[in-house]
Structure formats: C-alpha cells, structure tokens
Design a protein with these regions (language model features):
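Surface-exposed, glycine-biased beta-strand/turn segments
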Residues: 18-96, 103-105, 132, 137-138, ...
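Short, charged/polar low-complexity linear motifs in solvent-exposed/disordered segments
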Residues: 92-93, 114-117, 156
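Aromatic/His-enriched, Gly/Pro-containing loop or helix-boundary segments
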Residues: 100-102, 107-138
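Histidine-centered catalytic micro-motifs
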Residues: 153-160
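Bacterial Sec-dependent N-terminal signal peptides
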Residues: 1-25
Length: 160
C-alpha cells in the first residue's frame, strides 16, 4: 500500500506545474527600448486600481510604439483627461491591447482623428472603428509615447 501511495505521489508531481509557460509567444514588445515598469497592474491609485502596466520612457515623448501582433484598430479615444489619446487593437488571437497617454497616433490615424474632430466640432472622441478601416501588422508603428490625459509624466500605459 505504501508503495502505491509513493508512486501516486511521484507521478502527481510530474503532471503538475505552478505556471505553464506560454509556448505561443503571441506578442512582441510594444517598445524597442528596455522595458522598465513605472506602474504595475492592480496597484491602488487614488480612486481606482490600475488597469494595466506603465512602461518608462526616460521622460521622453515621441518614442515609436509598435503593434505586438497583427490585427485591426477597434477603438480610438481622445480626451483631455483619463487615458488622453488611446488606441485599442483587436488581434487575430482574440486579445485586445490598449495603448494610452500617447502624444500622437501614426500618420493615417492622426489624419482620420483630425478630420473627425473637425467634422464633429469637438476635441474629445470615443470611436468604435469598423474592422476593415485600419489593418495592423506585427511591428507596424501605431503611435508615439506621450503624456496626454491624466498622466504625471511621459510613459506608455499598456493593457492586454
């Protein structure tokens, strides 16, 4: 009986893992600089829990942000508060990534937003984008880091 219990115990350790490593490598890094965090997921803020992670940009504005996977732009927000300029990308793997506090979007999206703001005669926007409008490939520049919205310094707010 003891031998059977020992065998079961040994076998159970072979089939359990505390964490399963992601074998798919679904995403690349959104920045081509060393990734240093200035804010972590779930940390307590003055009136909410932080919903993503913040990457430091060495106090620089305008560092290119790259799409970590292929997909399409599904939402764009522009506001003087909150996320400021933010872009949402829905990826082929079913995940959506969010990039916030941007200085600006890429040229094509910037022009689209500029035209929308003038057509609607308003600065603040929250637009759902049709799937075919802005196709994004892995590594495409989607915007540039900034300090827009309710931000205390240049950085990239990133969510998956």
């Amino acid at each position: 009986m003891k031998i059977i219990l020992i065998i079961i115990l040994i076998l159970s350790f072979n089939y359990t893992k505390a964490q399963v490593k992601n074998q798919n490598n679904d995403f690349e890094a959104p920045l081509k600089i060393p990734l240093i965090l200035s804010g972590t997921f779930g940390e307590l803020r003055s009136n909410h829990f932080h919903s993503g992670i913040d990457f430091k940009t060495n106090q620089e504005i305008g560092i290119p942000i790259f799409s970590p996977a292929s997909g399409y732009v599904s939402r764009i927000k522009v506001s003087p508060t909150g996320f400021g300029k933010a872009i949402y990308i829905t990826h082929e793997n079913g995940f959506t990534t969010v990039y916030a506090h941007l200085e600006k979007f890429n040229e094509e999206i910037n022009q689209y937003i500029f035209d929308k703001q003038y057509a609607l005669k308003q600065f603040s926007l929250d637009i759902s984008i049709e799937k075919e409008k802005f196709k994004i490939q892995l590594g495409d520049t989607i915007g540039y880091t900034g300090n827009s919205g309710s931000s205390s310094g240049p950085h990239l707010h990133f969510e998956i």
